[in-house]
């Protein structure tokens, strides 16, 4: 794959939302239970900054996935910690793109001045947990039965990695 990573632009938002919405029905990735709209994600899109960006990954002008870095917990003392979200188009899943995307994030740590990365993953989402663990993330917390998806309670696993001192 000849992929390019770039900062997301407003015209990418429909593709970002489409990729996100494609994960909802599977009940493995997001706690949203119904599809979201482009309009409902405008504030989220606009709150990304140079230091906490939203990237798209594209090949031949087609968005294959996106990465969001967001501040953790919204308090000043946590400014060196980020929460990462990685979403991949259904046609691009299972081809190693997730590994490339997570490595891309880790490579940005110095330039974006973060030291710790967190991933919030449902406990039954073994592929995502394995991806993070492959990169040295550890299970820092398990929040048992905090989400209910179609009547089934699910755990939330917080995976963390300290990248640099």
Predicted feature locations:
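Conserved GNAT acetyl-CoA-binding A-motif
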Residues: 109-121
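A short beta-loop-alpha structural element at the N-terminal edge
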Residues: 4-16
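Glycine-rich acetyl-CoA-binding "A-motif" of GNAT/NAT acetyltransferases
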Residues: 62-66, 127, 153
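Conserved beta-strand-loop-alpha-helix junction that forms the acyl-donor binding cleft
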Residues: 93, 119-129
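Conserved acetyl-CoA-binding loop-helix of GNAT-fold acetyltransferases
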Residues: 94-107, 129-134
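Conserved catalytic-core motifs of GNAT/GCN5-like acyltransferases
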Residues: 71, 118-121, 138-155
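Conserved GNAT-fold acetyl-CoA-binding loop/helix
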Residues: 17-44
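Acetyl-CoA-dependent GNAT
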Residues: 34-91, 102-103, 162-164
């Amino acid at each position: 794959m000849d992929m390019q990573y770039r900062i997301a632009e407003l015209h990418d938002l429909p593709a970002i939302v489409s990729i996100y919405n494609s994960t909802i029905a599977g009940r493995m990735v997001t706690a949203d239970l119904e599809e979201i709209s482009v309009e409902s994600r405008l504030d989220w899109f606009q709150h990304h900054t140079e230091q906490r960006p939203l990237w798209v990954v594209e090949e031949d002008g087609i968005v294959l996935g996106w990465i969001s870095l967001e501040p953790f917990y919204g308090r000043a003392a946590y400014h060196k910690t980020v929460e990462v979200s990685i979403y991949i188009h259904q046609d691009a899943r299972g081809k190693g793109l997730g590994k490339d995307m997570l490595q891309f994030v880790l490579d940005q740590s110095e330039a974006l001045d973060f030291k710790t990365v967190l991933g919030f993953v449902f406990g039954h989402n073994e592929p995502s947990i394995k991806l993070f663990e492959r990169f040295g993330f550890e299970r820092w917390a398990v929040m048992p039965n905090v989400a209910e998806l179609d009547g089934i309670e699910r755990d939330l696993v917080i995976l963390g990695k300290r990248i640099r001192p």
